[in-house]
Amino acid sequence: MVPFYPRVFGWTLAGALALGLPDAHAAPPGASQPADVAADTGGGAPVTIVSDVHEFVIQHDGSLDEHDDSTLRANDANGIDAIAQRYVWFDRNLEKVDLLAAETIDRDGVAHPVGADGIRDVQEPRSAGAPTFQDGLLRTVVFPGVEAGSSTRVAFRKTRTKPVNRGYFGYTVEPSREPVDSQRLIFDVPADMPLYADARGYVALPPVTANGRTRYEFEYRHGPYDRIESGAVGYATYGDRLVVSTLPDYAAFAARYRNAAVDPGADDPAVAQLARTLTAGAADPRDKARLLYDWVQANIRYVGLFLGETAAAPHRVTDILRNRYGDCKDHVALFGALLAAVGIRSEPVLLNLGSVYTLPSVPGYGGGAINHAITWLPDLARYADTTTAGIAFGYLPPIVMDRPALLVDTGVLSRTPATQPRGRLARVEIDAAGAGTTRFHAYVEDDGWTAELERNLFRRATPDSVAQLANNRLRQSGLRGRA
């Protein structure tokens, strides 16, 4: 961790670039190619980030001005679709976007501005179903005359009018894995607000302090990237990344989440009554926790907004209960309130939902950092994730196993289990004595974390799909016939 003295959450810079095949007219493997040609085509990549500058001006109260200027080049026909239409995401309830420039630059260097009819705002698809959590819009820019060798440039200013996390700034970025000629990230903060960074591949320039403010700058350049192997851990585990934060460590990060999550209405009589009704007749704490887990899992629809894309605090428990939907931190808040109502302790846990098995030395939100919340029950020594269907209480979905886990109440980094029990008893009987048709009978009994997956599969199946499942299992046994 590098402290600097005198994202914002998890955005991947330069847009989401479409992948493509190498240029069909490129030289065959092993053939020589002039150095200037190889550089100009991005080493076979369909798109090159020519220039990408992001400047953030942060105030003490969390208000923010962001200035972006980004130019992408289509190296071949496969890169045209990736740069011909670009997007600027913003939350219209919190932010204002001013488009400063939008133009196509042809191969001769002549700029062709985008007309007013090529710029429009559209509702982000995932926001349409959950307006309570986010009202995201995409400022869409459609560029004219894009062909192989041309570039598109977008420059905009985004102003955050309502700070999401007052007094805190954090930003996480990892490359989009397209060649980068030049990228600069600039953070202009009050001089008395230390900025901490975990930089891998990004070069930190000496900070400059003047007029009560400090300017931190990071530069990044990269040629063509190696192909990621199938089954590899997440790129953020070993690849380039930059995480900056005004919080020095995970204990401070946990305290900030803990303070923001305080809900005076968590012990509302309706919540307590529901918990007592659901656990009536159960004496053992584990049985009570299981009943509450099952109810939240079945009755609170999971709205998958990654932690860090919204204000890092759950909604009020009474609102979650009334709406019957919520994101991961809302699931944790409601489940925790129900547990507390029957005397069972719990605390939120922050971790990464994905194939990332380490966290940056600087705390932050993002795809390669923290982006999910689950629950820890210390008295039962169990983690629980109510957002995942088909996983019984006492077990975890594999996607959150063996991950660093930040316990919010204590501020301590722990780790979720690397393994969990599973078992299968299978018995097959084949009656081949009779003439003609051979009868086949199979008995399968699952135990452990996979058992509920099987139960859930058949529980949700229609009569027709049950027959289809049986026939599929017959084929998997290497037999031919009809179930």
Question: What spans do the regions from the language model cover?
Answer:
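Hydrophobic alpha-helical elements and their junctions with loops/disorder across both membrane
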Residues: 19-22, 109, 282, 296, ...
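Beta-strand-rich, non-transmembrane domain signature
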Residues: 25-250, 270-271, 315, 319, ...
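Bacterial N-terminal signal peptides that target proteins for export
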Residues: 1-12
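Intrinsic disorder/low-complexity signature
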Residues: 2, 20-22, 152
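Bacterial N-terminal signal peptides
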Residues: 10-23
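Secondary-structure boundary elements
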Residues: 250-323, 342
